From Swiss-Prot:
Alphabetical GO biological process terms: heme import across plasma membrane; transmembrane transport
Membrane-spanning segments: 80-100, 121-141, 155-175, 177-197, 209-229, 242-262, 303-323, 336-356, 371-391, 407-427, 440-460, 466-486, 503-523, 575-595
Consequence recorded when altering Y530A: Decreases heme binding and cellular heme import but does not affect localization to the cell membrane
Region (Disordered) location: 1-51, 610-630
Sequence ranges on the Extracellular membrane side: 101-120, 176, 230-241, 324-335, 392-406, 461-465, 524-574
Amino-acid biosynthesis found in the keyword field: no
A cellular component annotation (GO) from this entry: membrane
Ranges for region Heme binding: 522-576
Impact noted for substituting S552A: Decreases heme binding cellular heme import but does not affect localization to the cell membrane
Protein name: Low affinity heme transporter str3
Protein species of origin: Schizosaccharomyces pombe (strain 972 / ATCC 24843) (Fission yeast)
Length: 630
């Protein structure tokens, strides 16, 4: 499978990846017709100064070759297709369990942190989990390339189980945070692997639809997770975490077994046997000790560089959420020192990646225009999104005397919109074979959704305003996210799919962490200030601090009382300072979207390699003898 070289861009030539594959049957193969000549189609899908050479494409890891063998084998006969459907059902079951877990445990955060008198620590938790889990994705991606996709699923399951056990048994806020980090790695790792496998096994025209389909369980789970939350909170929030230490292994094991079986069957193919024999010969020529193999694996996943990245961003951003607890706030030397050290570490990371790292976490070959634009769009999308959503559940908790169930329903409004319109966006990709303009429309809708929440000096408090804003934000967000995901995966060859699919959420989650870091000091400074201003003078400063630390105390006063109405006004005033920057920053991804490429979404696995169509029985086989497994 040899990569095609980049053509120069002129008035009469466009790059190969923007060519439209006409579905003409010729021994089962698809033929690329003449490329479109419009300016839109002339956009460079990848860096023209850095092509994917034959040597680059041949240096392929074992895990990539294994999943390619699976992809080829499932289209050869009905049995392979049935097994593929079974695997699809299995990962959909994983998505169901993950949807229930995230829909419920997100609501438990308020109660868990309140039990430790650390409600405002939610932002610190969000920063820590966002950065660490996102930094782990490139490691998981490289691990899946070096070993296999099933092996990585097993590793993710291990993180899941450990995290749930630690959180369920936590006696301090520190233990709760550590367990939450493990859960976040497991949850984000599962989502990442599901997305990666969908990218491995589907063509571009179905990519967005199938990826969005993995999120559809949220459409159903939202209606009964409220009952689960209500029942758990009435007894003990810890069991809400602990039960998933049993559920997740039960639902993930079938998916792992089926994928392992598919790999085993695919490895019986003669071409794969030749590759394995060649790899065995290479091993015999260059024998390495276990320590040498381990060191090579550490270098290949760029473990040192990713640790620098994660530690640097964590140390830089955590002071924003810790200043309210530090003596003298920003005047505390520790806060200043953390920011300085974090900045220095990030500079060191940049230098290490550019000049020292033998296997950079972000190789230059994937830094094409399409990928960079997708990163910019999602980076600011998440940054603005975290500004709006970080304390939005707490805000709605204060506004109305909803039951736990109804409160959970409302908090999942945006989730439902994201899932429903995500499938719609994927269907539009299948019908029109393009994604750019739908993404632009989505970003405009998202801005309108933010705007509905803003009133002069206050945030909206009406139920209709809140509901419509969440629906529009979810709708617009789904159009954008699905577009970024598809364009990112389309812009690189299959051998780089794992790294590109992990780097996009890495940088966008850093954007979310920055948004959380900005939201935390705004919330921690504004809420106590406005609580003191709008609460009756009969409430002393200690009570004000207690209301701020434990928002459930405010709920003890019915809506309409002087104390409750004063608290609502204080929270509404504070949310205004989060919503204004959120809507302002949302114009940046909108501008970037106009620079996005607009690949034709056809039968190919990606848009930069020519011979990428799924092979069916009777098709001419693609030789794999030139592939070398590292």
């Amino acid at each position: 499978m040899e990569a095609k070289e980049t053509h120069s861009i002129s008035d009469h030539e466009v790059e190969l990846q923007d060519a439209k594959p006409e579905e003409k049957s010729e021994n089962g193969n698809f033929v690329f017709e003449k490329a479109f000549s419009s300016d839109e189609e002339k956009g460079s899908g990848y860096n023209t100064n850095e092509t994917y050479s034959k040597m680059d494409n041949s240096l392929q890891h074992r895990g990539v070759s294994k999943i390619e063998a699976v992809r080829d084998s499932i289209y050869q006969n009905k049995r392979g297709m049935y097994l593929a459907y079974a695997f699809g059902i299995a990962i959909l079951a994983c998505s169901w369990a993950s949807a229930i877990q995230s829909s419920t445990t997100y609501s438990y955060q308020v109660y868990a942190t309140a039990s430790f008198n650390r409600t405002s620590m939610i932002s610190t938790l969000e920063i820590a989990t966002a950065i660490i889990s996102s930094v782990c994705k490139p490691i998981l991606g490289k691990f899946s390339d070096i070993t296999s996709r099933p092996m990585t699923y097993t590793l993710v399951l291990l993180f899941y189980v450990i995290g749930f056990i630690v959180v369920a048994s936590s006696s301090t806020i520190s233990a709760y945070v550590i367990g939450s980090v493990f859960i976040s790695i497991g949850s984000s790792g599962l989502d990442y692997l599901n997305t990666l496998v969908v990218g491995d096994l589907t063509s571009l025209k179905w990519r967005g639809f199938m990826t969005a389909l993995l999120s559809t369980p949220y459409i159903a789970t939202v209606w009964f997770t409220g009952f689960i939350v209500q029942g758990i909170i009435d007894s003990n929030w810890r069991w809400g975490y602990g039960m998933f230490a049993i559920i997740m292994p039960a639902v993930m094991t079938p998916a792992v077994i089926i994928l392992m079986y598919l790999e085993r069957q695919a490895n019986k193919d003669e071409n794969i046997k030749k590759i394995i024999n060649y790899q065995t010969e290479e091993k015999n020529k260059n024998k390495q000790s276990k320590w040498q193999k381990l060191w090579k694996a550490v270098l290949e996943v760029d473990l040192f560089g990713l640790i620098l990245l994660g530690v640097g961003w964590s140390i830089l951003l955590l002071p924003f959420s810790l200043t309210s607890y530090a003596k003298n706030g920003w005047k505390n030397p520790s806060m200043i020192a953390m920011m300085v050290v974090g900045g220095v570490i990030l500079i060191a990371y940049s230098g290490y990646e550019m000049f020292i790292a033998p296997y950079p976490s972000c190789p230059r070959r994937v830094m094409n225009r399409t990928f960079i634009t997708a990163v910019i769009i999602d980076f600011f999308y998440y940054l603005a999104g975290y500004l709006q959503s970080m304390y939005f559940t707490t805000y709605t908790w204060i506004l109305y005397d909803w039951s736990y169930r109804d409160w959970t329903y409302f908090n999942n409004t945006m989730t439902i919109a994201l899932c429903v319109f995500g499938v719609f966006a994927g269907a539009m990709h299948r019908v029109f074979h393009r994604y750019k303009y739908l993404q632009i429309i989505g970003l405009v809708i998202k801005i309108v959704g933010y705007g509905i929440l803003i009133r002069p000096n206050f945030a909206a408090t009406g139920k209709v305003d809140l509901a419509w804003s969440l629906i529009l934000i979810g709708m617009g967000g789904s159009f954008s996210v699905v577009g970024s995901q598809v364009s990112c995966q389309a812009s690189v060859p299959h051998q780089d799919l794992a790294i590109a699919s992990s780097l996009l959420p890495l940088y966008t989650n850093i954007g979310g962490a920055i948004g959380a870091a900005i939201a935390s000091p705004i919330f921690s400074n504004k809420v106590p200030k406005y609580l003191r201003e709008y609460l009756p003078s009969s409430i002393n400063d200690t009570q004000v601090y207690n209301f701020y630390s434990d928002s459930s105390l405010i709920r003890e006063y019915p809506v309409g009382t002087e104390i409750r109405d004063g608290a609502i006004k204080a929270y509404s005033r504070s949310m205004f300072f989060l919503l204004v920057p959120a809507v302002s920053l949302s114009f940046i991804p909108l501008a970037a979207a106009f620079w996005q490429s607009n690949f034709y979404l056809g039968n190919q696995q990606n848009a930069v390699e020519g011979d990428q169509d799924h092979k069916k029985k009777g098709d001419k086989e693609t030789t794999q003898e030139e592939k070398i497994i590292i």
